[in-house]
Amino acid sequence: LKACGVDGIQDGIGRTGLVATIRGRSTASGSMVGLRADMDALPMAEHNDFAWKSAKSGLMHACGHDGHTAMLVGAARYLAATRNFDGTAVLIFQPGEEGLAGARVMMEDGLFERFPVQSIYAMHNWPSMKAGTVGLNSGAMMAAADRITIEVTARGGHGAHPYQAVDVVLVAAHITTAVQSIVARNLRALD
């Protein structure tokens, strides 16, 4: 990033996150726009012999994260070289996407207090798109994972008298089936 000519680099945000800033030809608008990419190394061995192979045994940038990071470095190089925009570009290199906590940890560490961006654009590869094209959408575009906890509590009973109790296992099974069918039967997975 230093070689790209960015104006500032702050590392250690959320422990291992990094943010680079690039000022446009003018900053009169005061706008700050974020570009974000994930940069997780995953705990798996890399069994290839490429020049860019991971230097850390048992860790590799799988799942396209190396591509995401490379795209954001490419954006940094272009934006720093041209500066053909008004405001400040904030390049967010986010760790911990796979663990679902990297963004939260960066925010808790003051990411948006230090860099009060008006909008953020996430970058993600999409192998089925034609090379050299960009996919855009108004609103949500990619799927996301989330975790929920549902606790089922009921009046227990004896196995010989199930009619006198509420079978929490059966209730939980029905909830599981109903929640699974929301996406599988009622919504498109990409909505």
Regions found by a protein language model. Give the residues of each.
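Acidic/His- and Gly-rich active-site-bordering loop/insert found
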Residues: 1-61, 70-85
